[in-house]
Regions:
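Active-site nucleotide/adenylate-binding loops and adjacent lid/helix of ATP-dependent enzymes
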Residues: 95-154
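ATP-binding N-terminal substructure of ATP-dependent carboxylate-amine bond-forming enzymes
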Residues: 1-104, 123
Length: 154
């Protein structure tokens, strides 16, 4: 039986539990806190910023994935040194750390996207809002937002 390690014990990791069971996959979760949403499958509680802890976790699984984009790529690079497959790759994860970089990368690949733009300053605000279809529209922080945090409907 393959063992998948998930870094992050949030909602997405929690949703992976029944899917893993149905597929016959053993799931281990590296959670940040005891009471995380994925507590049912949590096998390690610790700091995913600690490369030594992540490397130790990586030795017990066949592949590592993550339940959010905030895992630093350096940490995953260290885990990969243990010989564990990281999927998606740390390089792919890098594209998700900044929504502007992600959108630009998707555009270069020809991936369909909703209308979007970057408000650089107060003066560009009206032009960008007009270009994306006017009000109401969604404004997002390029870095650090998730689960509605850093998101505003205007």
């Amino acid at each position: 039986m393959k063992t998948v390690g998930v870094i992050g014990g949030g909602q997405l990791a929690r949703m992976m539990i029944p899917a893993a069971i149905n597929l016959g996959i053993h799931l281990k979760v590296f959670a940040e806190a005891e009471g995380s949403p994925a507590a049912l499958a949590t096998t390690h509680v610790g700091n995913y910023l600690n490369t030594h802890e992540v490397r130790d976790f990586a030795r017990d699984v066949d592949v590592i994935t993550f339940d959010h984009e905030h895992v630093p790529t350096q940490v995953l690079e260290e885990a990969r040194k243990s010989g564990t497959l990281i999927a998606p790759s740390p390089e792919a994860l890098t594209l998700t750390h900044n929504k502007i970089v992600m959108r630009q990368s998707l555009a270069k690949m020809g991936v369909p996207q909703p209308l979007w733009g970057v408000v650089e300053d107060v003066d560009s605000r009206e032009e960008v809002i007009s270009r994306v279809g006017g009000f109401p529209c969604v404004a997002k922080k390029p870095v650090g937002g998730y689960d509605g945090k850093g998101v505003r409907i205007i």
